[in-house]
Amino acid sequence: MMPLKMCTWGGSYPVGSPGKVGLLSFKETKNTGNKAGNESPVQELRQDVSKKIIECIIEESQKVLQLEDDSLDSKGKGLSDQATASHSVAGTEFSNIPGLLAIQHELQQGSRKADSQNAAEETELETQKCFPSDNNCEKSEKTEDETNNLTEVSSADQLDASKLETEILNKEAVEVKEGDVVNPASSDALSTKDFAAVEEVAPAKPPRHLTPEPDIVASTKKPVPARPPPPTNFPPPRPPPPSRPAPPPRKKKSDLEFEALKTPDLDVPKDNIASDSLLTTNMASESTVRDSLPSLDLASATSGDKIVTAQENGKAPDVQTVAGEVMGPQRPRSNSGRELTDEEILASVMIKNLDTGEEIPLSLAEEKLPTGINPLTPLTLHIMRRTKEYVSNDATQSDDEEKLQSQQTDTDGGRLKQKTTQLKKFLGKSVKRAKHLAEEYGERAINKVKSVRDEVFHTDQDDPSSSDDEGMPYTRPVKFKAAHGFKGPYDFDQIKVVQDLSGEHMGAVWTMKFSHCGRLLASAGQDNIVRIWALKNAFDYFNNMRMKYNTEGRVSPSPSQESLSSSKSDTDMGVCSGTDEDPDDKNAPFRQRPFCKYKGHTADLLDLSWSKNYFLLSSSMDKTVRLWHISRRECLCCFQHIDFVTAIAFHPRDDRYFLSGSLDGKLRLWNIPDKKVALWNEVDGQTKLITAANFCQNGKYAVIGTYDGRCIFYDTEHLKYHTQIHVRSTRGRNKVGRKITGIEPLPGENKILVTSNDSRIRLYDLRDLSLSMKYKGYVNSSSQIKASFSHDFTYLVSGSEDKYVYIWSTYHDLSKFTSVRRDRNDFWEGIKAHNAVVTSAIFAPNPSLMLSLDVQSEKLEGIDKYEDAEVLDNTSTGIVKTDNTEVLLSADFTGAQCFYVKNSFLYP
């Protein structure tokens, strides 16, 4: 058989010496110098040689396959002729391969298997010699001299070319389907046995009927090299990681949490919503998707944690931060490390009188401040310590009151009253200083001091109600006064007191709220207890409701120890039952004893809020908000804050949410069923004290009032800043904003009523943020007094620091006043039934419920008798009144509570 002539780069080897091509030995240590100099050219030559050799081998293998197809189809004669022709035509250096393969296929068909096995064994031995493994590297280096005797390489280029040829042959052998390794690396690899082995391990040709495309097209496709099997000494491949589930699609705006709360005109542009918002809409909609109830119920209110901490954005605050905020600042120490006493701390804090500029230590402020006229509330004292300022009562005394008092005449002692007025100014309206003066001047001065006391406290010596020991008689008239220049007719000059609830509250009553139905009244204040009062005609209904949920003293599941003790103390103190005798008059609307008492707070209560289904929220100076229900005795949930909670409000349309404002400067919208903060925002500015909060426009906006006189509006859907109003006068001492004490919406007119510590009440139009009306006449310099509307929004009422209850008409009656400013209302009516600061005054939301059946029958007869009572009261805003009955409630600094009824023919 003729030897095969190999095609190489840079020349061809002699035909008679194929051994130099087959057996190669890598002399890396000896040829380092040559390789270093020719490294880059050799790499380029390797790439070119590899490409050309691969193309030659692929082309020849395709020709072999074509010849085999032709030989199967043709006869024996044609087969021999084609083999001879293909052998004689040799266009390239590998032209002898098809002829040799064809001859070997016919002549040595019987001995192919044996020869191929021998060839494979010899090839494996030669391959191990030429390509030693990593484990046999040392052995290959030891036998380097023996290999050099068998192989001679003339130059570095020939060595590289031979190496490339060997690698290409190895790649061709790997492509075999059986996986046998065939490496023609020796001179025997060029023998006829190797050709037979290559022919045997060549890829099997598929049947003709399975080959849809022509041979020409198939010959142009290069076979894909098979991937060699992984080494056995390596671990199995790591399985692919589990596929992460696709994120859920973003919810539409209609599916957000507060979409149900939106009004048609509450459309916040998307551009105005920052991407780094305090709480995204997806976070805000986590709970509402699960909630399908339109309002709060007992099941959702009692589920979950009983104590909820303020966690904004769903992140729990740091433990150290919470501990420091809850425990408050540590007691200051001296330079030597000793803790300062209370007296030293008070002496170190300086308070500045904004009117006179005088600075005094806080330890002496009690003597300087007017304790007799305007006792400071605990909240006011706390804010004063933080802001280091106070406002004297003299500066904020109403001008109208001074004018009125100057015109008052006393037939028995007009000259004495003039002297006492001068003495008041000299003494600074301080009874304590007057007593010191009385000790010096004897009995005569004592008599003057008593007169001063009567004048300062607006008490009458002949009035039996001035005595603390005697009870207030029912249906008795009260002291009435009106603004200077207001000549009448008056609306409340015939008002009478019908019930006195003094004796229950121990200390001041800071807040009172009627339920939406008007049958329940909640009052709370300095004694840390919430008291619920029920109307006589509604007592049985609520008592049956309580008995339904508290049969045999049963309380809610998993109550806290505090709740159990609260229930026990509530029962021991004897809450009124249906069988109790009520000694009061039949005209009294409420029972004389509370329906129930809620205990749990550890400091003064500041605000209350009712839901439409008899849930009650209470906020306190103990930095908590507690949730109650009229059918339960214990606290349902406690919401903890960072600082004093000054204001709370249920959402008007979805009482699963409520708003809370705190002195820490944060406004929070709580989700009661989920027991978490749904949305929150923080006030900007130097003074971040929130002193009032409420909803307006039926829940469209949340409004807060600050200590520096700002009303800030936030859209409820995202609790984002909307706008603000700076509540202050344009000139005078009130041009600096004062503390906002109350915010009340005026439904149907897009207006809000703002009460502030500058002794002014303002009505703002939310359409253009303009001032619609300013009311003045009362005194509110440092208290938490707030004004509120009547049930039909015709009147507004407020307590005062001068012990009077002040009432204004919401709008001027043009039939009474001809030339008045439409944006000023100085025409007030005042009633007096208290001997201390009136801390709270409200109208009853449903006056008809306050009257018994007998009184209502008398009312019908009275309407027929007094037809003037049905005269329509047409005001400038179109408010029409069909009933002039009004019921008021007021409370003072001593805990006394009085009920008033305005209707002349009901109580003669």
UniProtKB/Swiss-Prot annotation:
Keyword Ribosomal protein: no
Bias (Low complexity): 556-568
GO molecular function: molecular sequestering activity; small GTPase binding
PTM (free text): Phosphorylated by ATK1; the phosphorylation stabilizes its interaction with RAB11A and RAB11B.
Annotated signal sequence range: none
Transmembrane regions: none
Name of the protein this chain belongs to: WD repeat-containing protein 44
Organism: Rattus norvegicus
Gene name for this UniProt entry: Wdr44
